[in-house]
Amino acid sequence: MAVSDRKLQLLDFEKPLAELEDRIEQIRSLSEQNGVDVTDQIAQLEGRAEQLRQEIFSSLTPMQELQLARHPRRPSTLDYIHAISDEWMELHGDRRGYDDPAIVGGVGRIGGQPVLMLGHQKGRDTKDNVARNFGMPFPSGYRKAMRLMDHADRFGLPIISFIDTPAAWAGLEAEQFGQGEAIALNLREMFRLDVPIICTVIGEGGSGGALGIGVGDRLLMFEHSIYSVAPPEACAAILWRDAQEGPQAAEALKITATDLQELGIIDQILPEPPGGAHVNPIKAANIIKTAILSNLEELWRLSPQERRQQRYHKFRNMGIFSQLP
């Protein structure tokens, strides 16, 4: 990616680090051109850059975590599928005449193990985002996902779900085609599946749009992803009639991985490479692959009945709250 493109995609809190990294590159380039040894100076600046990176990314606010989860260069479902699978074949259609590109899915192998992988798919540029409706599925997307999950259950394939959507599409056409019914059906049916189900929030986990493929035996979450009943801006617009109150809503909604693990919503936080998954997608893919294989090994030790029971009780036990004195 060109430097100018990278700068256009920088988040505000990333800019001090990017400026320091640019300075290091300039010094290194001048050193090579003039034959001057600046190894010590570069090492000192790189140490400062690493320290600054740790300071920035260890103290992000919930709203900054949301910005990072929406980063335009953040790896998508297809990025992870291609990175972690030995082979993969995409499957299409809901068998009702539609094939929603906002949800992708297919069969493949991870570490030699046959699996079904599916997830929300955002676009990488404006044209692609429009084609994929910014990762917001229509009812046909959820019906396609359920068809593929039924296929996986029939053939004994574990299901790997990647969650990354602002929300399910809420347009008039989506409502006319039964958006609520499609999501509700998926919720009901995923509880009855015999095969292991591992769901991972890789970016945004927004509302029922995330839940529509989010009922699983394990719910994993990258440390800079978010999972929420509604986007903070939408929540702020509802509660305070002002989307600018998004940061306050983000704090109240408890959208971060740390908050959600404390509340018992998610099972495991996956660490990201320093600076976020978009900085080192290959390392991020290796992290998620290791987590998937490890959890699959544990889940295969259980009988189908045990998995269904644990899955049911896992979701029934959600809803921990604290009461002020």
From Swiss-Prot:
GO terms for molecular function: acetyl-CoA carboxylase activity; ATP binding; carboxyl- or carbamoyltransferase activity. The gene is accA. It comes from Acaryochloris marina (strain MBIC 11017). Keywords: ATP-binding, Cytoplasm, Fatty acid biosynthesis, Fatty acid metabolism, Lipid biosynthesis, Lipid metabolism, Nucleotide-binding, Transferase. Its main location: cytoplasm. Pathway: Lipid metabolism; malonyl-CoA biosynthesis; malonyl-CoA from acetyl-CoA: step 1/1. HAMAP family: AcetylCoA_CT_alpha (MF_00823). Component of the acetyl coenzyme A carboxylase (ACC) complex. First, biotin carboxylase catalyzes the carboxylation of biotin on its carrier protein (BCCP) and then the CO(2) group is transferred by the carboxyltransferase to acetyl-CoA to form malonyl-CoA. The keyword Nucleotide-binding applies. This is Acetyl-coenzyme A carboxylase carboxyl transferase subunit alpha. Residues 44-298 form the CoA carboxyltransferase C-terminal domain.
